[in-house]
Swiss-Prot record:
It comes from Mus musculus (Mouse). The lineage of its organism: Eukaryota, Metazoa, Chordata, Craniata, Vertebrata. As a component of the tetrameric DNA polymerase delta complex (Pol-delta4), plays a role in high fidelity genome replication and repair. Within this complex, increases the rate of DNA synthesis and decreases fidelity by regulating POLD1 polymerase and proofreading 3' to 5' exonuclease activity. Pol-delta4 participates in Okazaki fragment processing, through both the short flap pathway, as well as a nick translation system. InterPro entries: DNA_pol_delta_4. It holds the Pfam family DNA_pol_delta_4. This is DNA polymerase delta subunit 4. It is found in: Nucleus. The keyword S-adenosyl-L-methionine does not apply. Residues 15-28 have a biased composition (Basic and acidic residues).
Length: 107
């Protein structure tokens, strides 16, 4: 039956370099700047509003604006976050801020 064959019998073994010259495994990557890691103020506010959209305890959010949902939750005594109200009042005409995640989907 012969000897057991290996893939290296047909293809030569090629050792790859481990990285660019002067780079060793023990070195850490350089620290990124503070502004590249932190989100902008607008992105932070939009993320807060997305989390508000996903919070089921304030009721459904389809078919109404975020401000209407916040007001309804406030009237029902559900204590929605005041930060959400402040963000919505700061951007009264911007649909990115006023409309929920699902405003583009038909009812």
């Amino acid at each position: 039956m012969g000897r057991k064959r290996f893939i290296t019998d047909s293809y030569p073994v090629v050792k790859k370099r481990e990285g660019p010259p002067g780079h060793s495994k023990g070195e850490l990557a350089p620290e990124l700047g503070e502004d590249t890691q932190s989100l902008s103020q607008e992105e932070t506010e939009l993320e807060l509003l997305r989390q508000f959209d996903l919070a089921w305890q304030y009721g459904p959010c389809t078919g109404i604006t975020r401000l209407q949902r916040w007001s309804r939750a406030e009237q029902m005594g559900l204590k929605p976050p005041l930060e959400v109200y402040q963000v919505l009042k700061a951007h009264p005409e911007d649909p990115h801020f006023q409309c929920s995640l699902w405003h583009l989907y038909p009812l």
